Curated annotation (Swiss-Prot):
Protein name: NAD(P)H-quinone oxidoreductase subunit K, chloroplastic
Described function: NDH shuttles electrons from NAD(P)H:plastoquinone, via FMN and iron-sulfur (Fe-S) centers, to quinones in the photosynthetic chain and possibly in a chloroplast respiratory chain. The immediate electron acceptor for the enzyme in this species is believed to be plastoquinone. Couples the redox reaction to proton translocation, and thus conserves the redox energy in a proton gradient.
EC nos: 7.1.1.-
InterPro entries xref list: NADH_UbQ_OxRdtase-like_20kDa, NADH_UQ_OxRdtase_20Kd_su
Predominant location category: plastid
Gene Ontology terms, MF aspect: 4 iron, 4 sulfur cluster binding; iron ion binding; NADH dehydrogenase (ubiquinone) activity; quinone binding
Classification via SUPFAM superfamilies: HydA/Nqo6-like
Pfam families for this protein: Oxidored_q6
UniProt subunit comment: NDH is composed of at least 16 different subunits, 5 of which are encoded in the nucleus.
Top-rank taxon: Eukaryota
PROSITE patterns: COMPLEX1_20K
Annotated gene: ndhK
PANTHER family per the UniProt record, alphabetical: NADH DEHYDROGENASE, NADH DEHYDROGENASE [UBIQUINONE] IRON-SULFUR PROTEIN 7, MITOCHONDRIAL
Keywords: 4Fe-4S, Chloroplast, Iron, Iron-sulfur, Membrane, Metal-binding, NAD, NADP, Plastid, Plastoquinone, Quinone, Thylakoid, Translocase, Transport
Length: 227
């Protein structure tokens, strides 16, 4: 047991009785039982999949991948997150029991990556949706970098006080509702799906600068184009 991470556990009496605090004991028990929920959407997740093999053997950290958010205390997001996927990601995070942690893996998850400049449907950073504990940059990050991120998360857990974490999350609320677009001009060339275009019945020609507008409804599965 590391006496640097748990200094109170190093205090023993002549009868070999260990004195510690409930927070240190709880943190120590959670260090070897981080059960991740793998949320991979693109190529970054392929690098994480290599950790399952014998070369890296992430089982030594107590990582047991779960398929249900109710059994996980760590969600690892890898890849691009779109506006349509955002409500599902937030729902998965909210279904995880406390305490829960997030590792953002890859440039696309952290900032939107190469899609951040010209994509209208990409979330520019998963931290706009859920709180992130460890950022793991790279395109894609190497498996060694993933292990380093897990090590840093374990150090954070070892020094954590549960009450302080809950209080911080209650004060700093994150975006937990569906994305909604405001009415705006068509992007770039304006070559939308012809079935979605709406033409005014009063005029046959529409000026280029006001050709099409789009409005994102509360439902994430449909778009409506209006004047």
């Amino acid at each position: 047991m590391n006496s640097i991470e748990f200094p109170l556990l190093d205090r023993t009496t002549q009868n070999s009785v260990i004195s510690t605090t409930s927070n240190d004991l709880s943190n120590w028990s959670r260090l070897s039982s981080l059960w991740p929920l793998l949320y991979g959407t693109s190529c970054c997740f392929i690098e994480f999949a290599s950790l399952i093999g014998s070369r890296f053997d992430f089982d030594r950290y107590g990582l047991v991948p779960r398929s249900s958010p109710r059994q996980a205390d760590l969600i690892l997001t890898a890849g691009t997150v779109t506006m349509k996927m955002a409500p599902s990601l937030v729902r998965l995070y909210e279904q995880m029991p406390e305490p829960k942690y997030v590792i953002a893996m890859g440039a696309c998850t952290i900032t939107g990556g190469m899609f951040s400049t010209d994509s209208y449907s990409t979330v520019r950073g998963v931290d706009k949706l859920i709180p992130v504990d460890v950022y793991l940059p790279g395109c894609p990050p190497k498996p060694e970098a993933v292990i380093d991120a897990i090590t840093k998360l374990r150090k954070k857990v070892s020094r954590e006080i549960y009450e302080d974490r809950i209080g911080s999350q209650q004060e700093n609320r994150y975006f937990t509702t569906n994305h909604k677009f405001h009415v705006g001009r068509s992007t770039h060339t304006g070559n939308y799906d012809q079935g979605l275009l709406y033409k005014s019945p009063s005029t046959s020609e529409i000026p280029p600068e006001t050709e099409t507008f789009f409005k994102y409804k509360s439902s994430v599965s449909s778009h409506e184009l209006v004047n």
